[in-house]
Swiss-Prot record:
CDD domains (alphabetical): SPFH_prohibitin
Record organism: Arabidopsis thaliana
Gene it is expressed from: PHB4
Induction: Transcripts levels decrease upon imbibition but remains stable at the protein level.
Sites bearing N-acetylglycine, chain numbering: G2
Cellular-component GO terms for this entry: cytosol; mitochondrial inner membrane; mitochondrion; plant-type cell wall; plant-type vacuole; plasma membrane
Keyword Flavoprotein: no
Protein's recorded name: Prohibitin-4, mitochondrial
InterPro entries on file: Band_7, Band_7/SPFH_dom_sf, Prohibitin
Length: 279
């Protein structure tokens, strides 16, 4: 009977010890938090509010239930947003802007107090649309293409300055897409068609002019040739014409001789045989 009481007492003490260890382990686990690489933590204290210091990478202690860590990713990340803006000549353009951003580490407690964890979603689209509309309004629609480097530079400078007011650093800014409204696109297409028609008409005129010049040169050559033949005939009589006729007949005969499918039939009534019906 005494051994049973000892066993029960031992098990009771063991259970109490296990419970105590469990409570201690839970308390210890609640007192630790880890900040991974490329991250920073901001502590919120229930009595003092947001603490001014920023906690770096590693495992750290806190007061359970009184302090809460909030983790920020401080690595450079991309953010893309679109904006529909009006140009100086009252055309609508669609622009897509990509920025690479990161928070200013020393100002993370203030960012948490004013903007929270999703600071980029609250700030970047707003200031991006504001800057794009302000810059695009200074250019005509066609200038956005011909002067694109200048437009990008103005957007970059204005957006970097505006983002710093919210403690956000921008490492890179690029206009990735630009498209015009349907009305302007039709006008550009009509202009291109008109330019192509003008080039085609210019080509037709140039071709006709070249053909006219060729006809004049050809007529002058034929006139000179006729004059030379006339002069030669006047000096040598009809002999030159007979010579040209003989040369032409010789060329025809040579051509016929090379063709196996052509038979030569002499003129006259006797055909191939020298027959005289009168004899």
């Amino acid at each position: 009977m005494g051994s049973q009481q000892v066993a029960i007492s031992f098990l009771t003490n063991l259970a109490k010890a296990a419970f105590g260890l469990g409570v201690a382990a839970t308390a210890l686990n609640s007192s630790l938090y880890t900040v991974d690489g490329g991250e920073r933590a901001v502590l919120f204290d229930r009595f003092r509010g947001v603490l001014d210091q920023t906690v770096g990478e590693g495992t750290h202690f806190l007061i359970p239930y009184l302090q809460t860590p909030h983790i920020y990713d401080i690595r450079t990340k991309p953010h893309t947003f679109s904006s529909k803006s009006g140009t100086k000549d009252l055309q609508m353009v669609n622009l897509t802007l990509r920025v690479l951003f990161r928070p200013e580490v020393s100002r993370l407690p203030y960012i948490f107090q004013t903007l929270g964890l999703e600071y980029d979603e609250k700030v970047l689209p707003s200031i991006g649309n504001e800057v794009l509309k302000a810059v695009v309004a200074n250019f005509n629609a066609d200038q956005l293409l011909t002067e694109r480097p200048q437009v990008s530079a103005l957007v970059r400078d204005a957006l970097i300055k505006r983002a710093r007011e919210f403690n956000i650093e921008l490492d890179d800014i690029a206009i990735t897409h630009l498209s015009y409204g349907a009305e302007f696109s039709r006008a550009v297409e009509a202009k291109q068609v008109a330019q192509q028609e003008a080039e085609r008409s210019k080509f037709v005129v140039m071709k006709a002019d070249q053909e006219r010049r060729a006809a004049v040169i050809r007529a002058e050559g034929e006139s000179e040739a006729a004059q030379l033949i006339s002069d030669a005939t006047a000096k040598a009589g009809m002999g030159l014409i007979e010579l040209r006729r003989i040369e032409a007949s010789r060329e025809v005969a040579a051509t016929l001789a090379r063709s196996p499918n052509v038979a030569y039939l002499p003129g006259g009534q006797s055909m191939l045989f020298n027959l005289n019906p009168g004899r």
